[in-house]
Each structure stands twice: as C-alpha cells, then as structure tokens.
UniProtKB/Swiss-Prot annotation:
Name the record gives this protein: GTP 3',8-cyclase
Sequence ranges assigned to domain Radical SAM core in this UniProt record: 19-245
Gene name tied to this protein: moaA
Residues binding GTP: 28, 77, 111, 171, 273-275
Lineage: Bacteria, Pseudomonadati, Pseudomonadota, Alphaproteobacteria, Hyphomicrobiales
HAMAP family registered for this protein in UniProt: MoaA_B
Quaternary structure and interacting proteins, as annotated: Monomer and homodimer.
UniProt-annotated binding residues for [4Fe-4S] cluster 2: 268, 271, 285
C-alpha cells in the first residue's frame, strides 16, 4: 500500500491556468457512483453501477487529490453518488485532512444526501470539515420518498441535526422541479434560515437518461426568483463560496439564498473547477463530454511527474463554456453520463 504520509509530491509548479486565463483552484471528486437514493432527476430506478474493480482505490484517490493540491487546488469537494456510502470513506477523508493542517488546502468539504450524516458527522468535524452541502428538495415525507424513490426524510433531518451539533455549517441544496416542489420553496427557505442554514436553488440539468421527460421537470429559476420576490425582499450581494451560485439576502428571514442557473444564466465565465470521477476520468466541464484518463497516467508510473503532465494537458483543453440545452423535440440529454458518475 502506498504510504500517503511519506510519498513526496511533485515539485511546486505554476498555477493551473486554462486557455481563457481562469485559474483552476477547485476540484470536485466523485468517490463513488453508488447512492442509497434514486432521485428521479438524477438516475434511473434500476441503475447499473460500475463494477467495484473499476473504481480507483482510496489510496489512488488520495494520490490524485494530493497532486491537484500541489498544483494549486485550494478547495476540495467530495461527491458521489453518495460519498458516505463508499466503504472506508473516513480513511480517505482523514488522510486528506493533512492538507488542511499543512495549509496547502483551504477547504475540505462534501455534498451529501444526508442519509449517513448522523453516523459520520462527528468524524467529519474531527477531520476539519467545516461546511457541507445537503441535498434536500422537500420537507414533505411522502414527496421526499417519491422524489428519492425510497429515501427516509427523518434520517436526513437527524443527520442535519448531528452535523450542526458537531459544529459543521450546513447549506441546503434544492433542485427546483416544476409542479413538484415549486410551491414549497418559500417554506423550505423559512425552515432553513430559521436554523441558520443557507439555501441554494438549482435548475435541473440535462444529464443522463432517466425514465421521465426532463422537459416536464424543468423550472427556470428566473421564474422562481420572480415568485419569491412577491413574498420576500431580495437584495443581491457579492457573497461567493467558490462555486457557481449567485446570492441574495432575504430581509424577512435574515438568511442567504443562492441560485445556480446553468440553463437560463450560465456561470462559465468565472469557472474555476474541474471534476474527477471515481474511475479516474477528469472532466474539464460539467456540460461537455471531453475527458482525460488520469487513471492510466496514475498507474503507469510511481512518479507523480507523469500524472502532473497529464493534468496539465487536460487543463489546456478546458472549454470556455458548457453546451447544456433542453432537447424538447427528442427528449435527449445534452450529456449522456449521469450526474451520479460525474459528481453532483
């Protein structure tokens, strides 16, 4: 097994700069494509997951993340699937936390559905995780079970409680879905803000084949914002978390509300991130199919220099923006791979 403490990293390099002058400082890593939910907008009910033998080992994920950190990544987010269902995931998180202690990494965080949070919240806090995103689209238990296909809302709420008690700041991510949760969004905002949690609303994205007509789910956030403005006083603020959300404050609740709008108002001009899958494929853009096989470079040499060069070559191909569209005529996704593989 590779000694992650003793293995030297590549020598310091210039920051990763893409062809459009944007520094890449944010890495999102999907540690597994598996999930204990089957959210209707994310994956098919009878999803075929990758064979476990195809996944990078935890040691390989650590090595890849460490090379990216050496090359200028300051924020690392673990995603899935559901990251906390990956076996021995806390071993990886514990090892990665050394980069927080050294000052090489500003933030180690994750996006989770919350189902396993009650179990892991204390350990996450001990590893230096200070912020997490919890995906939660409704506070109605029956609708929650419908959208997740078999999720238990009470477990998620218990997980949020545990995270907050452990001192972790929780942000709620909610996908806005037409005729499903649009009428509930004000209630969700009041509930979250009442507990000191920010909320980010997200437009559904055309990724992966699912059983539903995606055009029936799509709800533009411009419309949601207009509806909210009839109930709340919204004020734009320059607050940023390193991601694509644009934020407002709500006077009536005192909380922050973010909007992620890949369809109606893209966030490409300031994109600072790339995405690594659990099989070692690097996607330079969420909404493009171009990728780079870092697993090959990882396994070809014990030296990190070859891997560093493969990363540089990939970053040189980072596009200016994505190609997301809702194909209303053929109901085809813009990107064939599922979000659960790329990392949500």
């Amino acid at each position: 097994m590779r000694n992650v403490q003793a293995q030297p990293l590549v020598s310091p390099t210039e920051p990763m700069i893409d062809p459009f002058g944007r520094a890449v400082t944010y890495l999102r890593v999907s540690v597994t494509d598996r999930c204990d939910f089957r959210c209707t907008y994310c994956m098919a009910e009878h999803m075929t997951f990758l064979p476990k033998k195809d996944l990078l080992t935890l040691e390989e994920l650590d090595r890849l993340c460490s090379v990216f950190i050496e090359k200028g990544v300051r924020k690392l987010r673990l995603t899935g699937g559901e990251p906390l269902v990956r076996k021995n995931i806390m071993h990886l998180i514990g090892n990665l936390s050394r980069h927080l202690k050294s000052g090489a990494l500003d933030e180690l965080t994750l996006t989770t559905n919350g189902s396993q949070l009650a179990r892991f919240a204390g350990e996450l806090a001990d590893c230096g995780v200070r912020r997490i995103n919890v995906s939660l689209d409704t506070l109605n238990p029956e609708k929650f079970r419908t959208i997740t296909r078999w999720g238990d809302l009470s477990r998620v709420l218990e997980g949020i409680d545990a995270a907050q008690k452990a001192g972790i700041h929780v942000k709620i991510n909610a996908v806005a879905l037409k005729d499903f949760n649009d009428a509930e969004i004000p209630e969700l905002i009041r509930w979250a803000h009442g507990r000191g949690m920010d909320v980010t609303l997200i437009e559904t994205m055309p990724m992966g084949e699912i059983e539903f007509d995606r055009t029936d789910q799509y709800l533009p956030l411009s419309q949601v914002r207009a509806d909210l403005a009839s109930q709340f006083t919204l004020a734009d603020i320059p607050y940023r978390t390193g991601g694509p959300a644009r934020y407002v404050t709500i006077s009536e609740t005192g909380g922050r509300l973010g909007f992620i709008t890949p369809m109606t108002y893209n966030f490409c001009e300031s994109c600072n991130r790339v995405r690594l899958t659990c099989t070692g494929m690097l996607y330079m853009c969420l909404g493009q199919n171009d990728d780079a096989d870092l697993r090959k470079a990882l396994r070809e040499s014990e030296s990190d220099e070859h891997l560093s060069q493969a990363i540089d070559e990939a970053i040189s191909r980072k596009p200016k923006g994505h190609d997301f569209i809702i194909d209303r005529e053929h109901n085809r996704p813009s990107v064939a791979r599922h979000m659960s593989l790329t990392g949500g």
